[in-house]
Amino acid sequence: MKPTILEKHSCLSSCSERRRLIQGAAALAFLGIGAHSTAKSVMEVDLIGAFAANTFVESIEALGGAPLSSSLITIDAPSVAENGASVPITVSSTLPGAIEILLLVDSNPKPVAAWFTIPAGTTAFVRTRIRMAGNGTLYVVIRTDDGGLYAATHAIEVTVGGCGFQDEGDTIEPMLASAARIRATLDNNGAANVRVLMPHPMESGMRSDKAGKLVPAYYITDFMVTLAERLVFSARLSIAVSSNPLIAFRVVGARVGQRLRVVWKDTRGDSRSSESIVIT
C-alpha cells in the first residue's frame, strides 16, 4: 500500500509498520474511499464515543467509519507549524444545515481536540488554537441536521512538537485570576463576530513540572455562549486545545447592545462566567 499522509513520522511515532497500515486504511475509510458511499445516519453515529476515544481508529469507528469528503468545508491552517503547542485553526463551511463541527488530529494521544455545536442562526465557522504532538493530519468533520457526516483534511508539519503538551511555567493560579476577554462586534451584514479568550492552563496531564513531578490534568471541558439569553454556541474541549483557549465564531441576526454571556466548566468542577455586549 502506498503510504498515506497518516503514515508520516511524528514525535509520537514508535508504531510498527502494521499499525501504520491500519491507520492508512482507517483514513481511507474515514473519507468514504473504498468503504460506504453514503453519509451515515444519525443512528449510526456516536459523537460522544468519538470524543472520548483514545485512538484515531476508535474515533473513526465511533463516527461510523465513512464521512463523505466535501469541498464545501474550508480549512485555514498552516502547512508548517513552528510551535506544536499552539497551532491556529480556522474552519468554515457552506454545507446546508451544519450543526456540529469536530476537530481531530491523527497523531495526538487524544484524537478529538474539540466538538463544537452550532445552533440555528450561528454560522458554520470557528477559529481556535490546538496542540499537535508532531507531524499529522487535521480532520474536520461536520454533521448536518439530516444526519449526514462530511469531512475535509489538512496535513500539518510541526517544527517543534508539542510532545507532552508542554505549557510555559508551573504556576496556574495567577492565570485564573483574570476574567475571560470577550469581544463581539457587529458587521455590515448584521452578524456578530465573537471572540472569546479564556485564561486557563489546559493542563494535559502529560508533562512534568520543574521538580519532575507529573502535573495533573486540568482543563476546560464545557463552554457555552448565550446572546440575549438564547444559546448561540457551545463546545466540548479536550487536552488538545491550547492553553488560554481562544474561540471565535459568528452569530447572524444580532443587534448592538445585546448581552453576551460566556460560561465554562473545567475538570475540577469549577464554573466561571463573563459577560459583554455587542458593539459596532
Language-model regions: role of each:
Residues 198-214:
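Short amphipathic, basic-aromatic surface patches that mediate peripheral association
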Residues 1-16, 27-33:
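N-terminal secretory signal peptides
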Residues 43, 160-181:
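Low-complexity, Pro/Ser/Thr- and charge-rich linker/hinge segments at domain boundaries
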Residues 155-161, 277-280:
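Short beta-strand edge segments in extracellular beta-sheet folds
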Residues 120-126, 240-248:
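Aromatic sugar-binding surface patches on proteins
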Residues 145-151, 265-274:
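Short acidic/polar inter-strand loop motif in beta-rich domains
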Residues 35-68:
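C-terminal segment of N-terminal export signals and the immediately downstream linker at the start
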